[in-house]
């Protein structure tokens, strides 16, 4: 297996950050009506965040198992990428919670009366603020995920540059030489 290209990993993390940013915008701007419409519009967002979280987890495993882990300063980047995995997972949880708060229109158990329009309206009115809160929390976590990916990409680039700087051979420079007679005054005999 060829060695991991850290420059390529940094670029892939920048791409992942852009995907988190795009999903953040989609979650922030999602428009829905409680019920089936909300399920139809929020479900793809949940699936996408799970995909991005899995990608972040794969990147974390690749970097942790590479020569990058031996470079000074890499721990901060690895921990930051682990926080991206956590934040994106929390975003998925928030989207799932929005779906859980969604008022579904299924039939009640046998023997219970079906909801009338006033009850449905009240259920929707209760659900909307909860769903909106969960969606706002998901958007926040996605924003943190994007920022984390940018930080890690920058950290990799910085750590590589520092490591290359340390491996350069040291060139000694010599200062100007002074002639011994020019720097001393002659002795006076008595």
PLM features: residue spans?
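Surface-exposed polar/charged interaction patches
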Residues: 23-26, 30-33, 63-66, 101, ...
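Conserved alpha-helical segments that form or flank metal/cofactor-binding pockets of metalloenzymes
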Residues: 51-58, 97-98
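Short, charged/polar, low-complexity loop and linker segments
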Residues: 1, 28-37, 61-76, 118-129
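Terminal, compositionally biased segments
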Residues: 1-18, 147-190
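Amphipathic alpha-helical coiled-coil/helical-stalk segments
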Residues: 78-80, 85-87, 92-173
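Short, charged/polar micro-motifs that form catalytic or ligand-binding hotspots
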Residues: 3-6, 39, 46, 71-74, ...
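Residue-level signal for the start and early helices of compact helical domains
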Residues: 51, 69-72, 181
């Amino acid at each position: 297996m060829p060695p991991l290209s850290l420059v390529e990993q940094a670029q892939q993390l920048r791409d992942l950050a852009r995907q988190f940013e795009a999903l953040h915008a989609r979650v922030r701007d999602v428009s829905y009506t409680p019920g089936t419409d909300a399920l139809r519009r929020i479900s793809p967002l949940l699936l996408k965040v799970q995909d991005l979280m899995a990608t972040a987890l794969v990147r974390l495993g690749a970097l942790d198992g590479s020569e990058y882990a031996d470079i000074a300063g890499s721990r901060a980047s690895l921990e930051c990428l682990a926080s991206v995995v956590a934040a994106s997972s929390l975003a998925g949880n928030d989207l799932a919670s929005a779906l859980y708060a969604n008022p579904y229109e299924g039939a009640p158990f046998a023997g219970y009366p079906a909801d009338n329009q006033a009850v449905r309206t009240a259920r929707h009115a209760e659900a909307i603020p909860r769903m909106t809160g969960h969606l706002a929390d998901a958007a926040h976590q996605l924003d943190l995920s994007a920022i984390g990916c940018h930080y890690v990409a920058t950290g990799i680039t910085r750590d590589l540059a520092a490591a290359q700087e340390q491996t350069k051979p040291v060139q000694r420079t010599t200062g100007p030489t002074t002639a011994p007679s020019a720097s001393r005054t002659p002795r006076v005999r008595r």
